[in-house]
Each structure stands twice: as C-alpha cells, then as structure tokens.
Swiss-Prot record:
Name of the gene: HHP3
Subcellular location: Membrane
The keyword Membrane belongs to this UniProt entry's keyword annotation: yes
Tissues with expression: Expressed in roots and flowers.
Extracellular side: 98-147, 206-210, 266-269, 334-344
GO cellular component: membrane
Pfam families hit by this protein: HlyIII
GO BP terms in the entry: response to hormone; response to oxidative stress; response to sucrose
Protein name: Heptahelical transmembrane protein 3
C-alpha cells in the first residue's frame, strides 16, 4: 500500500484585504505588490495624503531590491543616497590630498564654487565667492584636519541612516521602530558634527570657549537621541515635536556665531562665512517647514505619491544646507590659516 506523500505546508499568501489586524510577527510570505494607504497596518500609516504605492512587509531581499524599483519611497532613498555619495567623495579627497583639498568637482556642477585647502594662495582669488573660493597657507602651525572630517563623517552618517531607513523600515514592525530611531539619531549626529569644525577653528585662540560650546552641543545631541528613543515620539503625531527639537538644536548655533562676530567684527570675510551659514539655516528651516506642513500633497492628496511630496523636498533642502555649511567651514579654515597670529 502506497503511502501518500505529505506535501509541505506552504506559507500563507496574504491578500490586500487581509492586512487589517495582521500580526507583524507572523511568519508570512507576502506577494510583492504595492499597497494603498487604507490597507496598511497602523505602524506604516505615516502620511494620509500619500494614497498609493506603499511597500508592506516584503521579504528582506525584495525590500533591498526595491531601491531599484519605483514606489513612493524611491526618491526619499536616492536623494540622501546621492548626498551621501557627494560627502563620501569629499571625505576621500580630504584624506588623500596632503597639500590641497579641491571640491571643484562638486561645487562647480552645482553653484560654480571652487573650494580648496592649499598653500601660497590668496584668500579670495575671485571677488565673487560663489564662483571661486581659494584658501591661504598657514604661516604657522599646520591646521588640524580632523574637525573637518568629523563634520563629513557626521553628514555621511545622517544621510546613509536616512536612506537605509526609508529603504528597510517597511519590512516589519520591528524594523520600522528600529530604523526610524536610527534615522533620528543620525539627524542628531549631523547637527552635533556640524558644530565641531566651525567652533574648533573659529575659537582657536579661545580654547575655554571652544570647550564650552562643543561640550554643550554634544550634551544637547545626546539628550535629543535619548529623548527620541521613545517609540511614542516616533509616531506621526509627534512630527512637529521632532522638527522643533532639531531646529532648536540647530538654532543654538546663534550663540557661538554672535560671539565670533563680536570677536572679529572688523574682518569682512567673517560676514561672507556668516552669509553661507544663514543660507544653511534657511535651507534647513524651509525643509523642516515642508516636513511638518506636508505640502504640497496636503493640497492635492494622491497627486504627489511618487514624486514631489514634502519629504522628498525636505531631503533636497537638507543636502543643500549641508553643502552650504561645507562652504562656511572651509571659509573659516581659510581665515584661520590667513592670520599671522592666533585665530583669524
């Protein structure tokens, strides 16, 4: 008598109508398809004005491969991934070049700016700094490069955490909670890192103030990360709170910036650096405004699902602000090198 072969039980195929009430911990094999907002589990419902093209609990392999497919997170992933590539390029150049760091390849293509850290050059080779910014040699001790690298690494950390979070947070509830916390930690890291280079170089003659400012922003960043570890603060309801927290951290730069102006008010080049820093602040502020208001998708729900929604615009402004801050930092390095004595 022949025994019937017992077929292996195949994983359950979950259709779009089965999502409501689904336990994300269940072992399920999900059809790789894009979902509508109303069919998502609660933890994936972040923006009700984006109606379609959601990934939901895809396999890890499919989730990784979705970086190369078209859905409502594609541009969120790539806007910051491209930004990461730009900062990685600058980091490699900064580490490899011993006498000169040229950022012409990045800034010539974006704003016609050429920035370098070199020797035996004039501070402003061209009066129009948006087209050409040069730097002077240090007539004394070599200026340390590590604060500049701290900023580059912090920016890269923020951008790659953001890209990976947008890519993988849809895989499961556990991934969702973990990666959005990682994303917020990355933002805090970038804010703290952005303080290091300008403060280190600007207060080279005032080590006590330098220590005070760097310690203060580091403590604020640590407190922000601890605060945002709360799962409740990762929910859409606290979107304004998160934006205001990050803006408050960034706004604290007003204090050391004002201090620098008081110390070096008679140096016109300081005001050039300040102009770029104002551009940085405006970029972050405008980006945060889009992030909180969820414009333009709020005005026409469903029309900006794939491209043009607020979070994508927010990402673009973050990268623009980070690049403007690079110019500020390199200008401050130039000023520090140009000085025949301590500081500027």
């Amino acid at each position: 008598m022949k025994r019937r072969r017992s077929a292996k039980k195949s994983p359950a195929m979950v259709t779009v109508t089965d999502w409501k009430g689904l336990d994300c911990g269940e072992e399920t094999r999900i059809v790789r398809r894009l979902m509508k907002f109303e069919d998502l589990p609660e933890y994936l419902k972040d923006n009700e004005f984006i109606h379609n093209h959601y990934r939901c609990q895809w396999s890890l392999k499919d989730t990784f491969l979705s970086a190369f497919s078209w859905h409502n997170e594609t541009l969120n992933i790539w806007t910051h991934l491209i930004g990461f590539g730009i900062f990685l390029w600058m980091t490699v150049v900064s580490c490899l070049e011993t006498t000169e760091i040229s950022l012409a390849g990045v800034f010539n293509g974006m704003a016609g700016v050429r920035i370098c850290l070199s020797s035996n050059q004039t501070l402003l080779h061209d009066s129009n700094v948006t087209h050409h910014i040069s730097c002077l040699t240090s007539q004394g001790e070599a200026i340390p490069k590590w604060p500049w690298l701290v900023y580059l690494v912090g920016a890269m950390g923020c951008l790659i955490c953001s890209s990976v979070s947008h890519l993988l947070a849809c895989h499961s509830k556990r991934f969702n909670v973990f990666f959005w916390r990682l994303d917020y930690a990355g933002i805090s890291l970038m804010i703290v890192a952005s303080f290091f280079a300008p403060i280190y170089y600007a207060f080279s003659c005032h080590p006590n103030f330098r220590l005070l400012y760097l310690s203060s922003i580091s403590i604020l960043g640590l407190l922000a990360i601890i605060t945002l570890l709360s799962p409740a603060l990762s929910t859409p309801r606290f979107r304004p709170f998160r934006a205001n927290l990050f803006l408050a951290m960034g706004s604290s730069a007003v204090i050391p910036a004002t201090h620098v102006l008081c110390l070096y008010w008679d140096h016109p080049n300081v005001f050039i650096a300040l102009g770029y820093e104002i551009a940085t602040a405006l970029s972050y502020f405008v980006g945060a405004t889009f992030y909180v208001s969820r414009v333009p998708e709020r005005w026409k729900p469903g029309a900006f699902d794939m491209a043009g929604h607020s979070h994508q615009i927010f990402h673009v402004f973050v990268v623009m602000g980070a690049l403007a801050h690079c110019v500020t930092t390199l200008l401050i390095i130039d000023f520090s090198r140009a000085s025949p004595s301590c500081g500027f």
